[in-house]
Amino acid sequence: LPVLVKGILRPDDASLCFENGADGIIVSNHGGRQLDTATPTLKQIEPLRKEIGKDKILIVDGGIRRGTDILKCIALGADAIQIGRPVLWGLNYSGKEGVELVLDILIKEFIETMILTGCRNLNEITRDLVREA
């Protein structure tokens, strides 16, 4: 069973996780609920990926609300994303059907974003697609 460590924001913490046997990390600031000044997860993807290399699992959790957010995470180095709050909104809205609706919307937005950026597959999602405002 793979072991993933959640709540990682610092490169040195990521290294410690792997030195101690973790199979991957989950970049998370716990939705900003713990510390209102916590670093946004999106800003930590690149430094963490640089620290751990391309072969280690890096999942992003936090702040993902749209398909464009998914593309940004992948472009910056995430292997996968986790979503929480949007799923809860869907669950509250209409139970299982609401969750399915939220997931359908996110998938459609992500595919649309890939099309609009000229990406035919995940391998074509690259760092140059993301710019800071």
For each of these PLM feature ranges, what is it?
Residues 87-88, 95-133:
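C-terminal extensions of enzymes
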Residues 1-60, 68-89, 122:
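Alpha/beta enzyme core
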Residues 64:
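Short donor-sugar binding/catalytic loops of nucleotide-sugar-dependent glycosyltransferases
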Residues 53, 94-95:
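Glycine-centered helix-coil hinge/cap
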